[in-house]
């Protein structure tokens, strides 16, 4: 179920303050965040945000095609390494 259009998109206040501070200084700096549920808004375009995936922070460069998506969509949490090999030969 999607968020109601009457409400604004969710962005963590701390993350929003960091973005606004960097926009006023016109500096580019990596922003570290744990807020995977935050929605990407147009003021974030051009910044690099390091998103936590449960183990480490993955730096993601925000471009205009990412607006409207959540930050967590770009930092996968699971690492699929393939199915286990069947060891039928060892049983014979």
From Swiss-Prot:
Tree of life domain: Eukaryota
GO BP of this protein: ribosomal small subunit assembly; translation
Gene3D superfamilies listed in its UniProt record: 30s Ribosomal Protein S19, Chain A
UniProt-listed PROSITE patterns: RIBOSOMAL_S19
Subcellular location: Plastid, Chloroplast
Primary localization class, coarse: plastid
Alphabetized GO MF terms: rRNA binding; structural constituent of ribosome
GO CC annotations on file: chloroplast; mitochondrial small ribosomal subunit
Keywords for the protein's UniProt record, in alphabetical order: Chloroplast, Plastid, Ribonucleoprotein, Ribosomal protein, RNA-binding, rRNA-binding
NCBIfam families reported for this sequence: rpsS_bact
Family: Belongs to the universal ribosomal protein uS19 family.
Purpose of the protein: Protein S19 forms a complex with S13 that binds strongly to the 16S ribosomal RNA.
Protein name according to UniProt: Small ribosomal subunit protein uS19c
Native organism: Panax ginseng (Korean ginseng)
Lineage: Eukaryota, Viridiplantae, Streptophyta, Embryophyta, Tracheophyta
């Amino acid at each position: 179920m999607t968020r109601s259009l009457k409400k604004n998109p969710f962005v963590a206040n701390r993350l929003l303050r960091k973005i606004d501070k960097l926009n006023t200084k016109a500096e580019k700096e990596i922003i570290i965040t744990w807020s995977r549920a935050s929605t990407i808004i147009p003021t974030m375009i051009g910044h690099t945000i390091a998103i936590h995936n449960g183990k480490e922070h993955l730096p993601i460069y925000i471009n205009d095609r990412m607006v409207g998506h959540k930050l967590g969509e770009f930092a996968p949490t699971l690492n699929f390494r393939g199915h286990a090999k069947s060891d039928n030969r060892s049983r014979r």
